[in-house]
Amino acid sequence: MRILVEIAYQGNNFLGFQIQQNGRTVQQQFEKLLQRMHKRHVRIHPSSRTDRGVHAIQQYFHFDTELNIPMSQWQYAMNRTLPDDIYVNNVVTVDDDFHCRYDCVGKRYRYKVYQAQHRDPFQSGLKTFIPETLDLDKMNRAAQQFIGTHDFTGFCSQKTEVESKVRTLYQSEIVKTDDGFDYIVTGSGFLYNMVRVLVAFLIEVGKGRHEISDVPKLLESKNRKNVPFTAPAEGLYLEKIYLDENELLKDFGNDIKIHRKKSLQND
C-alpha cells in the first residue's frame, strides 16, 4: 500500500529535508519513526528537497507499507512521536504508481522580508531583515519579467548539476505586507538556490542597483557572476505543492503548459 503524507515544518533546526551524514534532517526524522513502526528501513520520497533553514507550509512525501493500520490512525501515530518543529497535516492512500516527485506539476514559494530600523529577535529565523528603504513597485515590475519559460542558468547556484536549466514561472510578484514585503513565485520547478537568487536580485533592483530592463539581458547572459548574491534561507517557505494539474490550470489558466518532473531535477 502506498501512502501520501502532507507535512509542515520549521526549518531553523534542520540541515534540510534530505538525509545528511551527520546532521538533523526532516527525512531522517520520518525514516527513524517509520523504522520503529515497521522494524525495518522505510524510504520516503518527497515532492521537494528543501535546503538548510528553509521552512515548509505544505510538503508531501510518499512511502510503501504493509502495516494494517487504519488510515485515521496514521496522522495521530506520527504526530505523537514527532518533534515540535514538524507536523503531519494529512495522510491518505494513493495508487501504487503514484510518485510524489514525478506527479508534482508545480510549486509555490513565498519569501518573507520585514523592514525596520532595528533587527527584531522574535522574527529571527522566520523572516529576513532588511533595514533599507526599497522601491517595491519597481521590484514588482522586475519580478514579473521572470514569468514565462526561461533558461535560469544565471539565477541559480553554480553547483547546480542538472543538464537543463529551463524552467517555467506562472507567477512572480512582490506583495507589500504590514512590516515589509513577500515575494511569491510559482513555477514548474526550481533550480538549486533559484528562489533565493531571484530575491537577492530583486532587492538590488529595489535599492536602485539594477534596472527592470536588466532582466532580459541577465537571463540571456546565463552568467551567475552577473547576479552574485543569494538571499538568506531563513525567509523562504515552500508554500504549496501542486499534485493536481487541474488545480494548477484553475489558478493560472488553461493555456499554460504542464511540466512533469521526469525531466526536471534539483527541485
Swiss-Prot record:
Cited CDD domains? PseudoU_synth_EcTruA
Carries keyword NADP?
no
What's in the keyword line of the UniProt record? Answer: Isomerase, tRNA processing
The record's catalysed reaction(s) read: uridine(38/39/40) in tRNA = pseudouridine(38/39/40) in tRNA
What residues make up the catalytic site? 51 (nucleophile)
**HAMAP family reported in the protein's UniProt record:** TruA
Which InterPro entries does the record cross-reference, listed alphabetically?
A: PsdUridine_synth_cat_dom_sf, PsdUridine_synth_TruA, PsdUridine_synth_TruA_a/b_dom, PsdUridine_synth_TruA_C, TruA/RsuA/RluB/E/F_N
SUPFAM superfamilies attached to this UniProt entry: Pseudouridine synthase
Explain the purpose of this protein: Formation of pseudouridine at positions 38, 39 and 40 in the anticodon stem and loop of transfer RNAs.
Question: Which GO molecular function terms does the record list?
Answer: RNA binding; tRNA pseudouridine(38-40) synthase activity
Q: What is this protein called?
A: tRNA pseudouridine synthase A
User: So what family is this one in?
Assistant: Belongs to the tRNA pseudouridine synthase TruA family.
Q: Does the keyword Isomerase apply?
A: yes
Write out the residues that bind substrate: 109
Q: Which Gene3D superfamilies match?
A: Pseudouridine synthase I, catalytic domain, C-terminal subdomain (3.30.70.660), Pseudouridine synthase I, catalytic domain, N-terminal subdomain (3.30.70.580)
**Complex formation:** Homodimer.
Q: List this protein's GO terms for biological process.
A: tRNA pseudouridine synthesis
The enzyme's first-digit EC class, named in words, is isomerase
Q: Which organism is it from?
A: Staphylococcus aureus (strain JH9)
Q: What Enzyme Commission number does this protein have?
A: 5.4.99.12
